[in-house]
UniProtKB/Swiss-Prot annotation:
InterPro entries assigned: 3-IsopropMal_deHydase_ssu (IPR004431), Aconitase/3IPM_dehydase_swvl (IPR015928), AconitaseA/IPMdHydase_ssu_swvl (IPR000573), IPMI_Swivel (IPR033940), LeuD (IPR050075)
Name listed for the protein in its UniProt record: 3-isopropylmalate dehydratase small subunit
Enzyme Commission numbers on file: 4.2.1.33
Gene: leuD
Lineage start: Bacteria, Pseudomonadati, Spirochaetota, Spirochaetia, Leptospirales
Enzyme class, spelled out: lyase
Pathway in which this enzyme or protein is active: Amino-acid biosynthesis; L-leucine biosynthesis; L-leucine from 3-methyl-2-oxobutanoate: step 2/4
GO BP terms in the entry: L-leucine biosynthetic process
Amino acid sequence: MKPFTILNGIAALLDRPNVDTDQIIPKQFLRKIERTGFGVHLFHDWRYLDDAGTKLNPDFSLNQERYKGASILITRDNFGCGSSREHAPWALEDYGFRAIIAPSYADIFFNNCFKNGMLPVILKSEEVEELFHLVSTNVGAKVIVDLDKQTVTGPTGKIYYFEVDSFRKYCLYNGLDDIGLTLKQESKIGEFEKKQKEVEPWLYAI
């Protein structure tokens, strides 16, 4: 998993509350377990005018030229609600997003973001509203998300502070998913297995 330290990038605006996981990545695209290849289907029903995904909807915000290459998504309350599907953060990350800024998230989606190397930042509703205004009126300006300092710096330099669990922060900062965390204990696991073989050898008789 790629470490998350400081993200300095274009922020795209999605001015919709209660965006559910079926809107993030529709169910017909959940036919594989690899984490790549989902970005093209992100927000499919909003991004495209046809089922085949060949005609872009010019009215959808992410299709605007100003948001090309965006790595930060700023959106509204209760983002990621609906059914539990890890494909939702996969699709967002595969599209290019590394951080999301919103007033609130659905719990399962929130947890899945951390497990997949993406930072879901929670700011107050009025702070998100201010960022919406600043980003919309400063075309080409970038937003900075600093995990170490736990800050978001807006286009005009104003700083917003956010909270993050210390363990999740450690994992993101060091690029550790569940497998990576387990591998860090590989030597201790080996020591345990060695002792267990001596005490309970029948467990390894196969």
